[in-house]
Amino acid sequence: MILRRWKGFCLAAEEEALFPRGAEMCGEVFAPLVFLVRRDPLRARGLYPIRDLSELDEPEGIGCLTPSSPAEGEMAAFVRAHGAGVLNAAFSRAFSILQAWSAAKKDGLVLTLVGLGDVGGTALLALKLLGRELAKIQIFDPNRAQCQRYEMELNQVLSADGRTLPEVVICEEQDLFRCDLFAFTASRGVPGLDSKVQDVRMAQYEANRAMVGTYARMARQADFTGLFCQISDPVDHLSRSVFLQSNQKETGEFDFAGLLPEQVQGFGLGVMAARCAYYARQLGLDEDALRVYGPHGQGLVCANCCGGNYDAAISAELTEKTRTANLRVRELGFKPYLAPALSSAAASLLRLVRGQEHYGAVPLGGAYFGCVSRMTRFGPELRREALAPALRAELEKTYAALEAFEY
């Protein structure tokens, strides 16, 4: 393993060609340590943390959600003590993102919110009241009057505890990516309340894919170093599409000069966790033991627990109730947007910026997979725990479907 010092990082690689220009020789390992690799950018992560050296070369998939077997040796002991990052040099902007994320702010953040419909407007209300880490929320919507209304009304809101609330400002198109977080809630083709469509979320894919692609390309052109937060449905599929479209030239050819996979995260699983807890309470189940994985919709997996007490029948019942909870609200004559806007968007976004565990769809191989993670300077750190064999089989099935989807 070759070691080099660069911009305050200790870089480690098997090949000289992986080091950036200006990297200097160093005699011994120090923190922060970053391992450099070159892997297929279509199917590999770009920047991620490891707590054990065995995680450096593990296959990308559901196994990344389970504990790794401890590695041995001096380098392994250093990684266990200090942690490390893994950076995929196949992405042309890899080193600039490494620098930007290591110097990221913890507060005084700027968030751009695109789309002031039902979900966007509700999420904005919560972020205004609860977003103490945010200095400014930039809002953008084709309906200029809607922007003016929210700017006017939300800057007339009093703080309940005396803390300064984030300022709400109208954003011009050229400033959309002058921010730390870009939250996309806009949507087209949402089925009406009288629609017989069973998968309301996937029905929106084609229209929303085209719309979000415009913003993915804008992020690329702006050399965006922040986080693209995909909130409109279908969250997991659109997250992958944002990553892919940002890394294509105008000809459609991939050059991987756009967003790193970890610069895109989907926010749809939070409400599924909340809905699962709602139904678990009715069934008298232990809420702390509940687990929720996978996409926001078809393919969702809810479990009464992840370990030895996993019950396939109870988990299947929880999954079905949770997956179709939106239809129950529609049957009452309402669009189900309150819980998603608050649980999936506002609460999950704020837990992310606070460095707390949260629900979201993160890159894993050739898909974005919903799970619990915590944001670090090296990207999302996935929660690892032992999985019951039957539960793991369910997760493998839904992961395979996400990978096989034609984005």
Predicted region positions:
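Rossmann-fold NAD(P)-binding glycine/threonine-rich loop
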Residues: 17, 193-257
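Hydrophobic/small residue at the entry helix of a nucleotide-binding pocket
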Residues: 118-122
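Long, compositionally biased stretches enriched for glycine and/or charged residues
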Residues: 55-70, 281-407
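Conserved N-terminal Rossmann-fold NAD(P) cofactor-binding segment
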Residues: 142-179
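Rossmann-like dinucleotide-binding core of oxidoreductases
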Residues: 232-307
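Short beta-strand element of Class I
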Residues: 134-138
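Glycine/serine-rich phosphate-binding loop and adjoining beta1-alpha1 elements at the start
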Residues: 1-108
